[in-house]
Amino acid sequence: MKLHRWNEIAEEHLNPSLERRAIHTDRLTIARLNLKQGCVVPNHWHENEQVSTVEQGRLKFVYPGGAIEVGAGESLEIPSGVAHEVIALEDSVVLDIFAPRREDWVSGDDAYLRR
């Protein structure tokens, strides 16, 4: 077992409105992201299943055929391969869990987040 403390994990400043801390295990990634109001995570998809739990604020997830708002205390399940865009309607903190782990984040091949 290994104990992780969020405040001891290096924070990545991906762009002026998005910051991330991440833990990568052999089989999953868990990340805590801070999004400033107005932040847009551009439309993208990945093979990973994703569960996003909003801890603070409100996010709008836009996907083919619709959109859904997720607020504090709510979780959204995003199946593998589903394209989605995220818009921060308020300053927000979200906990994202991915399986399998985000190899693109491990390797730094996540340019869509760094715009």
Model-derived segments and spans:
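Short, conserved beta-strand element in jelly-roll/cupin
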Residues: L35, H46-F61
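Short strand-coil-strand connectors
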Residues: D26, V62-G66, L89
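Ligand-binding loop in jelly-roll beta-barrel domains
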Residues: S80-D104
